[in-house]
């Protein structure tokens, strides 16, 4: 079993609209900067897990088990080295942001085991107040390997006003 890690720090959270910023990726980069990082979210080295396929998500490769394991290992390496990491999520079909699939970016800062799954804690940069954006109990992705050949990495009920599910579709290493 992997040890729990929590690098979260509410003083490092950047609320939506800080200094007039209205870009979630910029918010994520500022959070990483506050954590002492100088390189963050390198898109050329990202792991792509899912892609939109009409009104559903499909695995981005022929071997999703291997790709998810590599992406989770990347996240774990970052956390174990004391470095939070940016991930892209999908919450709405048909948005044409970024690569046509990523609707939003958040920063993973922790890992916990609940006896069944590993949960990854994240800063929700789309929030204007710290209590909602930095919430260990609510802002967490489940890494679900119940079906090992079809892993999932999601937050079933995000803190968005519509409580849309967040599916992690990209992992962006910091190096």
Regions found by a protein language model. Give the residues of each.
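Noncatalytic regulatory segments and standalone regulatory/sensor domains
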Residues: 2-18, 38, 111-175
